[in-house]
From Swiss-Prot:
It comes from Leuconostoc citreum (strain KM20). This is Phospho-N-acetylmuramoyl-pentapeptide-transferase. The lineage of its organism: Bacteria, Bacillati, Bacillota, Bacilli, Lactobacillales. It catalyses: UDP-N-acetyl-alpha-D-muramoyl-L-alanyl-gamma-D-glutamyl-L-lysyl-D-alanyl-D-alanine + di-trans,octa-cis-undecaprenyl phosphate = Mur2Ac(oyl-L-Ala-gamma-D-Glu-L-Lys-D-Ala-D-Ala)-di-trans,octa-cis-undecaprenyl diphosphate + UMP. Its EC number is 2.7.8.13. GO terms for biological process: cell division; cell wall organization; peptidoglycan biosynthetic process; regulation of cell shape. Its main location: membrane. The gene is mraY.
């Protein structure tokens, strides 16, 4: 357990120590978030730096590799490549998205097709690494069993990575909301990984949780910095790949139900407006609807965190 706590501490310390410097640098370079004018009044947040995910992702990656090398040798470093690559690759995609938004001073960054291409290429590389490391292309489906997908495994891998990275991206709309929920979901998978004796995923998760806890010090309401797409895409990709590596991908639908609800609210809102020219919710993603009802960011955060925690505890008891 001590090696895991050291992993958490390393990522936490790196994030807490260097985040003030990143905030100062981003403010001086005027790399600040562009706040959408639609929906709840968030214009008071204009000028808040974005791309905070850059630091906690980097801190988590460094801590994870150090932990893998220190306690498992070269085999630990090699095994850590898959989850860390997924985390970093999608952070880079999100970083490009954030950078383009800042350069263009607009809410739209990476165009849809280039962004999807980048996500697809990342999935190809991840699958290639998995093949080189001998990870079986099998999928466990509840009530059916384990099936060998062969090359069709790529389709599932791509869908899972793109789907969950975008789901967490949609959830990142309030100070502390995604970071707090991600801590809970990663903690749940840490318990699952411990039960499966998967020490690599445990180390990886402790590293991410450490980085996120450090980030929350600066991201809680009223946030001094946002994680941006750099962090939100990375967190979803990290959860997607580790659920696959643990052999329980569909459990993420339960543990990440908050992310699913957020995504469904956007889909339902879009379909409703397209076909009936009516909005089903006051605003989507659904966390903004709570704002419309007069809830504060802290109240919404706490509600979502509590729901995630209940789901996590129930899921852990069921799986164990």
């Amino acid at each position: 357990m001590s090696d895991n706590l050291w992993a958490l501490a390393r990522a936490f310390i790196i994030t807490v120590v260097f985040m003030p410097f990143l905030i100062k640098f981003l403010k001086q370079s005027k790399e600040q978030a562009v706040i959408r004018k639609l929906g709840p009044d968030h214009q008071s947040k204009a000028g808040t730096p974005s791309m905070g995910g850059l630091l906690f992702v980097l801190a988590a990656a460094i801590s994870a590799f150090i932990g893998g090398a220190a306690y498992h040798g070269m085999s630990g470093v090699v095994a850590m490549i898959i989850p860390v690559f997924a985390l970093v690759a999608y952070a880079i995609i999100g970083g490009i998205d954030d950078a383009l938004k800042l350069i263009n001073h607009a809410d739209d960054g990476f165009a849809f097709k280039p962004k999807l291409l980048a996500q697809t290429l990342s999935a190809v590389v991840i699958m290639l690494i998995m093949w080189l490391l001998g990870v079986p292309f099998t999928l466990y489906i509840p009530m059916i069993g384990t099936i060998n997908l062969g090359l069709f495994y790529f389709v599932f891998l791509w869908f899972w990575l793109v789907g969950w990275s975008n789901a967490t991206n949609l959830t990142d709309g309030l100070d502390g909301l995604l970071a707090g929920n991600s801590v809970v979901v990663y903690a749940a998978y840490t318990v699952i990984a411990m039960h499966m004796h998967n020490h690599i995923i445990v180390l990886f998760n402790f590293s991410i949780i450490g980085g996120l806890l450090g980030f929350l010090i600066f991201n809680r309401p009223k946030a001094k910095i946002f994680m941006g797409d750099t962090g939100s895409l990375a967190l979803g990709a990290g959860l997607a790949i580790e659920s696959i590596l643990l052999g329980v991908p569909f459990s993420l639908i339960w543990f990440g139900l908050i992310f699913v609800i957020e995504t469904l609210s956007v889909i339902i809102q879009t379909v409703g407006y397209h076909f009936w020219h009516k909005r089903i919710f006051p605003m989507a993603p659904i966390h903004h609807s709570f704002e419309k009802f007069g809830w504060s960011e802290w109240q919404i955060d706490l509600l979502f965190w509590i729901v995630s925690s209940i789901l996590a505890v129930a899921g852990i008891f069921y799986m164990n």
